[in-house]
UniProtKB/Swiss-Prot annotation:
The gene is RRN3. Required for efficient transcription initiation by RNA polymerase I (Pol I). Required for the formation of the competent pre-initiation complex (PIC). Transmembrane segments: none annotated. Pfam families: RRN3 (PF05327). Residues 632-642 have a biased composition (Low complexity). One of its GO terms (molecular function) is RNA polymerase I core binding. This is RNA polymerase I-specific transcription initiation factor RRN3. Residues 630-650 are annotated as: Disordered. Keywords: Nucleus, Phosphoprotein, Transcription, Transcription regulation. Phosphorylated at Thr-199 by MAPK9/JNK2, which abrogates initiation complex formation. The keyword Transport does not apply. InterPro entries: ARM-type_fold, RNA_pol_I_trans_ini_fac_RRN3. The modification Phosphothreonine is found at T199.
């Protein structure tokens, strides 16, 4: 029986759909009626058999004998751009009765038939589907061309206007029948699969090959991805490969649209065009017409991204997130079995593509969103990352990335309860203590990222999580909360010879120092000052001569769940996302007190003064400055040459 098709979001619709996986609607022939109709076509005799002095069969047999005149006439008739529906139907009926003669010798003829404009009247569609079924069942050599033809219809047709040899217009055809045409193509795939069970195996390479170039229009990419996701529903064996293909393409977009570039584009557009697309108005001479257009499309335009790559990425990301919800939710409730299956697919893709990708900003949010469906999946994700981090057989870059993900996930996932946060902190801190114990008598017990990268990454995950969650950890019974934090023994970590305060991102270190200082958990400022004095400048050659720089990110820090700035995707993420909580006026005053010029060597005195050292590496501790300085650095010193590090041309 044909599987149901997916309706996540109709390409071109303004609003993102939250519909579940639905069966074929009344707009299409029902499954049982479809089969009955197919059987009628398969058994019906040709209505017209005479062409050019004989049947198609006779023409084909003559061609094999070397008589090509009738064959050439046949091809010319099929290539007629003004061919009528009745003519198409008549030819298809004859070809069905001659399908046994359509061997590989007639590959050119089949290619012409596959280019016929068959997505027209319902009668033409039904006859064409019957022909495809007969052809692939009798001549499997033509299975790939048939599948390729169908896949080529998963994007809007192009409208090309020429003046001489020059294309003056090349755009998507806004055909109202496009959704129905997509439905028909999916139906065609299912019919073919019924006669050739190996269809999915042959289909996947074709879907990869037909994936539009990422510089194609957003609508073209949206339609193709939409149709790939629908295929994954009725060909579930292809789901993993389809999702991997989509996410791989999203990554190529993501690494070419940094968060900073996106925000800069939005800010520039707001300043210059009052928040509208900066390209609009350049060719609109009629102000009244422009105003009317804006009024009609106002809600849609509010979701548009100014940055063109971000706009495409946002559309596709929201489509994937909507698909995930459609798959996992049944009647408004999470289906554990379906969600578990999807989690297995996505965690494998995450390991293969995301964990080794340094420059992605948004694609990884598919894991964030999936984990929000049920706590068990969030805990499974954390356990998976933990195993990656503490496994010495993994490359250091993978272990460090796992640490980055743990810290960012614990800090930003609003759906993770405090008990899970505490359990993860216990696990991380205990591992750090064991690591330090093992270094005490070793020859490598000194500060070096190359030697202890995973250790520093775990330290930063702890510091980062603590900064975000300290209010929750101390809420309720303050004395009990302090007792718990004291049991973590931050002092041993901070005072160790490995000196994590020197390696971790300065913004993280300074917030950690300020908060632990306030609650007398550990006193960091003397170490910070000593580290600052020991920080050696690095001389780098530039186009304008040598320049002196200080490496402020030796750990190559990356916070994968920094705030999402894609407008459509944010609607999925914001309800489950932990933003930085504003500090009270009293806290601000305490944290912002300037330190005296003299370096305070006594940490007890430093704590009593409640001061934060003011130097080049310390940021202002205000709610407005937090997210800006606490994000992944826009560029990192010593970044490893991992996948997608260098933006590739789209």
């Amino acid at each position: 029986m044909a599987a149901p098709l997916l309706h996540t979001r109709l390409p071109g619709d303004a609003a993102a759909s939250s519909s579940a996986v639905k069966t074929l609607g009344a707009s299409r022939t029902g499954i049982s009626n479809m089969r009955a109709l197919e059987n009628d076509f398969f058994s019906s005799p040709p209505r017209k058999t005479v062409r050019f002095g004989g049947t198609v069969t006779e023409v084909l047999l003559k061609y094999k004998k070397g008589e090509t005149n009738d064959f050439e006439l046949l091809k010319n008739q099929l290539l007629d751009p003004d061919i009528k529906d009745d003519q198409i139907i008549s030819w298809l009926l004859e070809f069905r009765s001659s399908v046994m003669y359509l061997t590989k010798d007639f590959e050119q003829l089949i290619s012409i038939i596959l280019r016929l404009p068959w997505l027209k009247s319902q009668t033409v569609v039904e006859e064409y589907l019957a022909f495809l079924a007969n052809l692939v069942s009798a001549q499997t050599v033509f299975l790939r061309p048939c599948l390729g033809m169908i896949a080529s219809h998963f994007v809007p047709p192009r409208v090309i206007i020429k003046e001489g040899d020059v294309d003056v217009s090349d755009s998507d055809d806004e055909d109202d029948n496009l959704p129905a045409n997509f439905d028909t193509c999916h139906r065609a795939l299912q019919i073919i699969a019924r006669y050739v069970p190996s269809t999915p195996w042959f289909l996947m390479p074709i879907l990869v090959e037909k994936f539009p170039f990422v510089r194609k229009s957003e609508r073209t990419l949206e339609c193709y991805v939409h149709n790939l996701l629908r295929i994954s529903v009725y060909f579930p064996t292809l789901r993993h490969e389809i999702l991997e293909l989509i996410i791989e393409k999203l990554l190529k977009l993501d690494v070419n649209a940094s968060r900073q570039d996106i925000e800069d584009a939005e800010e520039t557009a707001t300043q210059t065009c009052g928040g509208t697309d900066s390209t609009e108005g350049l060719f609109n001479m009629d102000e009244d017409e422009e105003t009317e257009h804006e009024t009609k499309a106002g809600p849609e335009r509010l979701d548009q991204m100014v940055h063109p790559v971000a706009e495409c990425l946002d559309i596709l990301m929201s489509l994937v997130l909507s698909y995930m919800k459609d798959v996992c939710y049944v009647d408004g409730q999470v289906d554990n079995g379906k969600t578990k299956d999807l989690y297995r697919d996505l965690i494998n893709i995450f390991d293969k593509l995301l964990l080794s990708t340094h420059a992605s900003c948004h694609v990884q949010f598919f894991m964030f969103y999936l984990c929000s469906f049920k706590l068990g999946f969030a805990e499974a994700f954390l356990e998976h990352l933990w195993k990656k981090l503490q496994d010495p057989s993994n490359p250091a870059i993978i272990r460090q990335a796992a640490g980055n993900y743990i810290g960012s996930f614990l800090a930003r996932a609003k759906f993770i309860p405090l008990i899970t946060v505490r359990s993860c902190l216990d696990l991380l801190v205990n591992w750090l203590h064991i690591y330090l114990n093992n270094q005490d008598s070793g020859t490598k017990a000194f500060c070096d990222v190359a030697l202890h990268g995973p250790f520093y990454s775990a330290c930063q995950a702890v510091f980062y999580t603590f900064v975000f969650r300290h209010k929750q950890l101390l809420s309720g019974n303050l004395k009990e909360g302090l007792r718990y934090l004291q049991s973590l023994n931050f002092e041993w970590i901070v005072m160790s010879q490995l000196n994590p305060l020197k390696i971790c991102l300065p913004s993280v270190v300074n917030f950690f120092a300020a908060i632990t200082n306030k609650y007398q958990l550990v006193f960091c400022y003397t170490i910070i000052e000593r580290n600052n004095r020991q920080m050696l400048p690095v001389i780098r050659s530039t186009a304008g001569g040598d320049s002196v720089q200080t490496c402020t990110n030796p750990l190559d820090t990356f916070f994968p769940f920094d705030p999402c700035v894609l407008k459509r995707s944010k609607k999925f993420i914001d309800p489950i996302y932990q933003v930085w909580e504003d500090m009270s006026a009293e806290e601000l005053q305490e944290f912002k007190k300037p330190m005296r010029k003299e370096i305070v060597e006594d940490e007890d005195d430093d704590f009593l003064k409640g001061e934060v050292p003011q130097n080049d590496t310390v940021i202002g501790i205000t709610p407005s400055s937090f997210d800006a300085h606490f994000r992944s650095p826009s560029s990192s010193v010593g970044s490893p040459p991992v996948l997608y590090m260098q933006p590739s041309p789209l």
